[in-house]
Every structure is written in C-alpha cells, then in structure tokens.
UniProtKB/Swiss-Prot annotation:
Protein's GO biological process: translation
GO MF term set: structural constituent of ribosome
InterPro entries (UniProt xref): Ribosomal_bL17, Ribosomal_bL17_CS, Ribosomal_bL17_sf
Organism: Rippkaea orientalis (strain PCC 8801 / RF-1) (Cyanothece sp. (strain PCC 8801))
UniProt protein name: Large ribosomal subunit protein bL17
SUPFAM superfamilies linked to this entry: Prokaryotic ribosomal protein L17
NCBIfam families reported for this sequence: L17
Entry-linked PROSITE patterns: RIBOSOMAL_L17 (PS01167)
Family according to the record: Belongs to the bacterial ribosomal protein bL17 family.
Subunit structure: Part of the 50S ribosomal subunit. Contacts protein L32.
Amino acid sequence: MRHQCRVPLLGKPADQRKALLRSLTTELIRHGQIMTTKTRAKAVRSEVERMITLAKDGSLAARRRALGYMYDKQLVHSLFADVQSRYGNRNGGYTRITRTLRRRGDNAEMAIIELV
C-alpha cells in the first residue's frame, strides 16, 4: 500500500504536472536559482537532487536517463561535466529553499530555490 507516499499534485493533471516539474528542473539547473511558489519549490527539489545524483554517477545509462528527463541536451552535458568539482564531496542537500514575500495578486507563498 502507498500510505503517506503522496506526491504533490499541484492542482494539475499528471501530464501537466510532469511537464511543469521538468521545466522547473531544467530552468533551475540552467540559472542556478528560480523564484516560484513554495509548494512547487518543494516538489522540484527532489527532481533536481535526482538529476545531480545521476550526474555524479556519470555512467552512460545515467546520462541517458538525464537526457530523457531534461529538455536541453547541452545543459545535460554541462551538468555532467562540472558536477564533480561542485558537488564531489556532498552527499545530498544540493538545493536551498528560502521563503520570500507573498505574491501580490493571489497572496501565494513564494520561495527562491537555488543550487548550493
């Protein structure tokens, strides 16, 4: 049984949710930090950590899994190239979520998620 193994649904159908998480993951790795809602930041954190762990593995199978998930091929190659120098001795905890002011239009909790 899958009790308490709930993924954040983000108020979207499964295909839109997967596309949103892929897009946020790609943009976070590209820019180093993004501002989004707190719930989306918490949801994308596990995906980003998974991509960085794949890059630390460095095998061909890991590279192909990352290419299948992220939207930018060049970004995957650059991630695999510089991840050992940046996160070589760190065992997880590659991201930091900082809460910021609420969004003006709908008062949603906003957060900045960044790579450490």
